[in-house]
């Protein structure tokens, strides 16, 4: 991308290079979103459009970044690397909030499998780290510069030294944090992830059967302080308010030492929320959080008044779009504190 944009003549050509690079980049790592369109026949014709149009749209951001770089008449020098890095990192930051935001697949995500390198993010934040990552990935372009061989080797050596120092720093942080893992928290967290066929969600299965399946899988021990985490949306055909009809199942199987975290839909008047609740052994609500960031087309239909006239709806079950809340408070249950995030929201954290 750097070399092509550096050699290209014309700002429109630079835009197209960035656009096509962005299209290729996003289609290679967003193809999986089409899986969500396979569960209902009405959505299957949209698969080719989702596969092509979403990466094509997101690629425009990279096109704009390269277009902006062309205004500087870049030469083969280190300042050109900085300009391109700043341009790409700024456009990725803009992408995080414009049109509702989609801060996904940043170039910095390349480090995801290498935790040692990621520890510095606690100081830099995601987007400054993204800038550093782009600069580092562009450093090898120095070999094409008209620099002396010693200058090239020195630049590459400095880059590797910085990378090594960061790796060692990360290793130290991870080693120190292992002490936290060894702390006796006096409770157990059990994540219940049943292999429930997707068809069960669309066949209006009796919620009692699903709850009993979850209870059986959780294997509650009356003497052990435990937090059970049930899946988001596992009770797809009832609302939170209906859960009281099944409270006897919870009372018969759980004790005062148990808490249950559950993802379930809730409604207030004409509004529907994707909620996370903390329940006690009698299914009483101890805390509740309503999702702030909803998945476009997945949980709500943009321009719903218009698009619904064409028979379109959100991808998830039901026709009415979810509503977004604007509050996210730390949940504190018996001095166990956590900040709730549901699914898609993690990319905004």
Locate each region found by the language model.
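Membrane-embedded alpha-helical bundles of multi-pass enzymes
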Residues: 1-177
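Soluble catalytic domains of enzymes that build or remodel membrane lipids, polysaccharides, and related
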Residues: 173-349
